[in-house]
Swiss-Prot record:
Family assignment from sequence similarity: Belongs to the HypA/HybF family.
Keywords, alphabetical: Metal-binding, Nickel, Zinc
Positions of Ni(2+) binding: 2
UniProt keyword Metal-binding, yes or no: yes
Binding residue positions for Zn(2+): 73, 76, 89, 92
Signal peptide: none
Gene3D superfamilies: 3.30.2320.80
Name this protein carries in UniProt: Hydrogenase maturation factor HypA
InterPro entries in alphabetical order: HypA/HybF (IPR000688)
Biological classification of the source: Bacteria, Pseudomonadati, Bacteroidota, Bacteroidia, Bacteroidales
Residue ranges of the TM segments: none
Length: 115
């Protein structure tokens, strides 16, 4: 379950940024999570809920943006929605696809409070 280590890394990163700015509390955390990122979204959410306990993020509002997968066929250049990493082009059937969106897994922003 690598989602727990990802959740812990998110908490460490955010707490480090809060500490560097002299903040005692993180009020808001905004995440972008792509459907093609390779994480189980529900498992990550559960792990994050567990990882924030006792941290500066414990009472933070967590905003999650889910990014749908999108790819472009390298053969016919059709842009199409992707449900899986190895989705074929719906136009020509090619598997030579460049992923345009959906692999994101990042902290987009944090809101901190100094006391």
């Amino acid at each position: 379950m690598h989602e727990l280590s990802i959740a812990r890394s998110i908490v460490e990163l955010v707490e480090e940024q809060a500490d560097n700015r002299g903040a005692s509390v993180v009020e808001e955390l905004e995440l972008e999570i792509g459907h093609l990122s390779g994480v189980e979204i529900q498992t990550l959410e559960f792990a994050l809920d567990s990882a924030i306990k006792g941290s500066k993020l414990e009472k933070a509002r967590i905003i999650r943006h889910y990014i749908e997968g999108e790819g472009q066929c390298s053969d016919c250049e059709t842009i199409f929605p992707m449900n899986a990493l190895f989705s074929p082009c719906p136009h020509c059937g090619s598997y030579l696809v460049k992923i345009l969106k959906g692999k994101e897994l990042r902290v987009k922003s944090i809101v901190i409070k100094k006391e």
